[in-house]
């Protein structure tokens, strides 16, 4: 039985992970749950899974949870704060760490798990894209293992040779028969909109993804397609791929989650219904497979699978992220930071949808930082960029 730590248990990835545990109670035991401030959902999760530890980032939420658990005579120990999260991410007893905290908040806990030599199921792409070389060096310096659980990267992982699977980020793709990686994108809810019409879309419309059930932040990232740009960066790092070895195609049906083209002309693809439980369950059970609880794909009901190139004019954030990766680690850190600020402002109805890309571009182009060589330097760039971004948004509002 594998013992599991779930970082971000009340988010969409965390909920999907716990659903898989419910379906496979003889295979997994939850020992640590971590969330931000949703004490009500955390209480329900503690009641069902009886973890040894529950950690709330928010101190007030932790206090509420502790009282409610005591009232119900549940013995789960409650802690709060970032330090506790990082400590429990490295817990010796844990076999799998699900890294599903959204945004930069997931960086330090993920690195803590890596430095402890844990097996990490990575959904928090920000940890990788802002720390890049630092992240991969930490990974190679100990026994830690990474399994991607983004649907696209997991799809790529599934159809790569076993040797590449076991040596992510360390091997030459062409020497292992791989010609290219084809990264698919749904295009979000606005792929067939004209850019000028996007200024008027609401947060609710932008969060209404046609295929996937996701959290609010990643839903907006999908709508701007910056998420696919970040996934491009993630694929470059995880699979040691060059820019010429990755292609991006919009595939509105979200049935083919990505493909790998081999040097003999073969293309292997991973297909399933758009449900994150498929990717997560594979990573949890690799190299085996278990019941995910997802519905099965019915080919009799598939009428069309379409593919086309993304329009960089319509989705400038996609091109911005691709270009930022080529500029280096500092640029990726800046872009991630300003994007978290602009997405939050859009969700709060402070700026329009198109302002996300405009402000992201302005802040990235007007920022100049030396390449970070430590996590502390990454965090400093992140902090300064957030302050600058907030000032920019405030100047537009008032």
UniProtKB/Swiss-Prot annotation:
Pathway: Isoprenoid biosynthesis; isopentenyl diphosphate biosynthesis via DXP pathway; isopentenyl diphosphate from 1-deoxy-D-xylulose 5-phosphate: step 1/6. NADPH binds at residues 10-13, 37-38, 124, 126, 215. It catalyses: 2-C-methyl-D-erythritol 4-phosphate + NADP(+) = 1-deoxy-D-xylulose 5-phosphate + NADPH + H(+). One of its GO terms (molecular function) is 1-deoxy-D-xylulose-5-phosphate reductoisomerase activity. NCBIfam families: Dxr, PRK05447.1-1. Catalyzes the NADPH-dependent rearrangement and reduction of 1-deoxy-D-xylulose-5-phosphate (DXP) to 2-C-methyl-D-erythritol 4-phosphate (MEP). Belongs to the DXR family. This is 1-deoxy-D-xylulose 5-phosphate reductoisomerase. It comes from Buchnera aphidicola subsp. Schizaphis graminum (strain Sg).
